[in-house]
Amino acid sequence: MRREDFVFCIGYEGNAAIVDGRLRARNAGRSTRELAEAGLYKQALCSAYWSRKPEELEEVLQVYNSRTEHPVSSSAELSRIYGISGIPEGAAKIKVI
């Protein structure tokens, strides 16, 4: 799985990752911070997980908290809100829709 596939993945079907092709085409070149600033928090979190840099997770948290009426206390809490737990193993195929 490539970074762009993971970042724009919307779910899984068996061992196939389902990727939002339109969203990926429009935003694939954006950095983690750029995704967060565009309001694409789920995608920004996925990008931060892919980078394996804790400071990117904190950056997403800061951007999120600066724009919401309901700030969260940690990047782990924000990840739970968006259903992100890390990079999944075993996605052998990519389906773009």
Map each language-model feature to its residues.
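Extended alpha-helical solenoid/arm regions of large eukaryotic scaffolding proteins
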Residues: 1-97
